[in-house]
Amino acid sequence: DFQNLMHVYMDAVFYPNIYQHEEIFRQEGWSYKMDSLEDDLAYNGVVYNEMKGAFSSPEGVLDRVVLNTLFPDTSYANESGGDPEVIPELTYEQFLDFHRRYYHPSNSYIYLYGNMDMEEKLNWLDQEYLSKFDYAPVDSKIRYQEPFDKVIEKEMPYSIASDESEEDNTYISYN
């Protein structure tokens, strides 16, 4: 039911098990993998592998280059899921610091919608979660991108499979 889902989501966001179990970071983020002694050491992890897939799509490459080129001075220039080339640079401590800083009620919007006793739900949220945190100033503003002084051109090569034609995998974006 709705009340139970609110509890599950609020608990997952504000009290995740990542602080008690580093293996969650290793499984979900990134870790080293070696199936046998003959194999090379390789990176692994749910997010790492998902982002490798996202970065292999021509459309995904185009989307990222367009955002990075249009908004280089804002958070939109960065891939929210992480760039697989730099994901392995993330430490467990940096991961926890990021959660402590940004996953805080002071940096949240909570939306409730539907036919319910709104005052009851808001009181519950306050008593069970929000009142247990002190206010913390969080700078999470999305910076304004200043207009460019001149036209910017950007080329981005990407790989395609050997059996794919360049004709069906060539893109141009005019912004």
Predicted regions and their residues:
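Extreme N-terminal "head/tail" segments of very large remodeling/mechanoenzyme assemblies
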Residues: 25, 29-30, 49
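Helix N-cap motif at beta-to-alpha junctions
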Residues: 114-119
